[in-house]
Regions:
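Catalytic active-site module of serine/aspartate enzymes centered on a nucleophile-bearing elbow/loop
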Residues: 129-178
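Alpha/beta-hydrolase
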Residues: 35-112
């Protein structure tokens, strides 16, 4: 199982309850609108460490123009809400002690302000999983596969090489969540 800067931070890490999370996602959805394709692309360019034609095509593919000519997400609010609800119903912290395969967590180093929280969450995942590896990708934000594609690919390749002869029968499972 390979996690690209996701799936390890829990609701309690950000002190969020379901109502708060739903309110935040609704506010995000309403605010994530743009008056033109140009203003949307400028916004997106500021978010990434590197920009390319491929990244631009991906950015354009996730948006659409509504009847009022606003640039909005193709993903519906109900989809975002369902994802948030699922994280509260089935938190990943409950799942990791049941995972019977190696886990590689590649996590971002930017923004630096969130690194302490990410460190705590990563250590918790390592304790819960039977075979987990945590690696930080330097100078990369949440979209680390875009910010540092070669570094991410090399780390995944090396990790797969080490785990290619994985022996499921000898895996020792521990549950540190209780």
């Amino acid at each position: 199982l390979i996690l690209l800067d996701g799936g390890y931070i829990q609701n309690e890490d950000v002190a969020a309850d379901l109502a708060t999370d739903l309110k935040q996602v609704q506010e995000f959805y309403k605010s994530y609108q743009f008056s033109s394709w140009e203003s949307y692309l400028e916004h997106e360019k500021a978010y990434y460490q590197r920009w390319s034609d491929v990244v631009q095509r991906a950015a354009l593919a996730k948006m659409t123009e509504d009847e009022d000519k606003r640039i909005i997400s193709k993903t519906k609010l109900s989809t975002y809400e369902a994802a948030i609800k699922s994280l509260h119903i089935y938190p990943s912290k409950v799942i990791y002690s049941e995972v019977e395969c190696p886990i590689l967590l590649l996590r971002s180093s930017l923004p630096e302000a969130s690194n302490a929280m990410k460190e705590v969450a990563a250590k918790r995942l390592i304790r819960a999983a039977s075979d987990a590896t945590d690696q930080i990708i330097p100078n990369a934000g949440h979209n680390l596969h875009i910010d540092a594609p070669h570094e991410v690919a090399n780390r995944i390749k090396k990790w797969i090489e080490v785990h290619k002869n994985y022996d499921r029968e000898n895996l020792k499972r521990r549950n540190v969540w209780e």
